[in-house]
């Protein structure tokens, strides 16, 4: 989980967001944030450019996702 925090602290990079936990039983706010990121079910992956709004969304759902840097998109 510490690696996620290190990636979020960087600026202007592309990150791949991977959903590793289920949405069942989660707060409606977190479910809406994940759907806005394009993650609907376990195993979904999306690439996002890391800006301030995406950082806030990732911080809100940090315990349900896995992040990795992407060099070329």
From Swiss-Prot:
Transmembrane segments: none annotated. One of its GO terms (cellular component) is large ribosomal subunit. Disulfide bonds: none annotated. Gene3D superfamilies: Ribosomal protein L30, ferredoxin-like fold domain. Keywords: Ribonucleoprotein, Ribosomal protein. GO terms for biological process: translation. One of its GO terms (molecular function) is structural constituent of ribosome. Pfam families: Ribosomal_L30. Belongs to the universal ribosomal protein uL30 family. Part of the 50S ribosomal subunit. This is Large ribosomal subunit protein uL30. It comes from Borrelia garinii subsp. bavariensis (strain ATCC BAA-2496 / DSM 23469 / PBi). The gene is rpmD.
């Amino acid at each position: 989980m510490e690696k996620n925090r290190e990636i979020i602290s960087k600026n202007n990079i592309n990150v791949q967001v991977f959903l590793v936990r289920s949405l069942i039983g989660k707060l409606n706010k977190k479910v809406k944030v994940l759907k806005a990121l394009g993650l609907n079910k376990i195993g979904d992956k999306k690439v996002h450019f890391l800006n301030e709004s995406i950082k806030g969304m990732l911080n809100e759902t940090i315990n349900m996702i896995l992040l990795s840097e992407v060099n070329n998109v």
